[in-house]
Amino acid sequence: MADERKERYINPYTDFGFKKLFGTEMNKELLISFLNSLFCETKKEITDVRYLNSEHLGDGYGDRRAVFDVYCMTDDGGRFIVEMQKAEQDYFKDRSLYYSTFAIREQAPKGEWDYHLDDVYTVGILNFMFPDNEYPADKYRHEIQLKDTEDNHVFYDKLTFVYLEMPKFNLTEDELVTMFDKWMFVLRNLSRLLDRPKALQDRVFDKLFEQAEIAKYSDAERRQYEESKKDYWDYFSTMKTAKRKAKKEEKVETVFRLKEMGLTPEQIAQGAGLSIEEVKKLIG
């Protein structure tokens, strides 16, 4: 693994990095390999993809739009929305479902139609874990479909959501077995690597490490990447600030609630997780 002070390869969690590796015609073999690794047991092999317009407008003026990181169609007509989710956000699942409707609605032709739909897949690469320990600590790949809640039978198999909880993936280089393992390792660790791991000698990774090496970029590409990296850092800084502010506000509310209950400053401090001095400043 790399010295954290250096960076040889781009960070795929940045907008520039993700689209450089997966969102260009030149690198579509990387996207094909990644998607095949996700569905090797449940879907026939993808041999080609065609990139589609990643920006979608609503049906009428003023309707909300959706902008996907990567949107493509496979050789068998299936549509894939691939999203890199930097941080947890409210109503993430609702947003994911909403985005999938664009890939469904655009299939409706003008004129007569029998309602036949091609498969729609939404792939979410999550740089966070689902809240409240929703899934076991060792389960980081989730494949979701519409199912009967009584017998778990698949009711509709043409709408699929795959979510990857990246922070849960902790396999070392020596533990990588499947192509899925290798792609997860790359996504999790690429920007921290100084050398190509011996476990990643498959031909497709020749292309990946070539395209990910910052030293080979033009001056313009380097500037674009640095700007994208700055946006990535700013985003996390803003999120951390918001969380600290929310936590502080929660403690203040706790202080006044405990005060109304008649507790002493010492008891309030213990209950709110603050010092006695901080409590006294708040309650006067």
Protein language model features and the residues they cover:
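Accessory alpha/beta interaction modules
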Residues: 1-162, 170-172
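Short, charged alpha-helical interaction segments and adjacent helix-coil junctions
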Residues: 2-7, 80-85, 181-284
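Generic structural signal for hydrophobic core residues of well-folded globular domains
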Residues: 25, 38, 167, 187-190, ...
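Short intrinsically disordered coil segments
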Residues: 137-144, 177-183, 227-229
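Low-complexity, glycine/alanine/valine/leucine- and proline-rich hydrophobic stretches
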Residues: 148-155, 178, 182-187
